[in-house]
Amino acid sequence: MSTKLKGPDGRIPDRLPDGSPAVSWERRWTEGSLPLWLVATVGGMAVLSVLGLFFFGSFTGVGSA
């Protein structure tokens, strides 16, 4: 990313002086160390795995009697 686009506080402004977007919409969703869609996908899979483990445990083991 270009350093000349950054403001005094280090953030990238939404618009350039001519009114055009400072960052294209394709790059806005993939900025940062990890893309947000990747974090959300891994988090969702973890939640589904834990819920599946609880359902599996309800049919087997101590609580199944």
UniProtKB/Swiss-Prot annotation:
Compartment list: Cellular thylakoid membrane
Bias (Basic and acidic residues): 1-17
Region (Disordered): 1-21
TM regions (residue ranges): 36-56
Keyword Membrane: yes
InterPro entries: PSII_PsbJ, PSII_PsbJ_sf
Keyword set, alphabetical order: Membrane, Photosynthesis, Photosystem II, Reaction center, Thylakoid, Transmembrane, Transmembrane helix
Gene Ontology, cellular component aspect: photosystem II reaction center; plasma membrane-derived thylakoid membrane
Topological type in the membrane: Single-pass membrane protein
Pfam family, one: PsbJ
GO BP terms, alphabetized: photosynthesis
Subunit composition and interactions: PSII is composed of 1 copy each of membrane proteins PsbA, PsbB, PsbC, PsbD, PsbE, PsbF, PsbH, PsbI, PsbJ, PsbK, PsbL, PsbM, PsbT, PsbX, PsbY, Psb30/Ycf12, peripheral proteins PsbO, CyanoQ (PsbQ), PsbU, PsbV and a large number of cofactors. It forms dimeric complexes.
Sequence similarity: Belongs to the PsbJ family.
Described function: One of the components of the core complex of photosystem II (PSII). PSII is a light-driven water:plastoquinone oxidoreductase that uses light energy to abstract electrons from H(2)O, generating O(2) and a proton gradient subsequently used for ATP formation. It consists of a core antenna complex that captures photons, and an electron transfer chain that converts photonic excitation into a charge separation.
Annotated protein name in UniProt: Photosystem II reaction center protein J
Organism: Prochlorococcus marinus (strain MIT 9313)
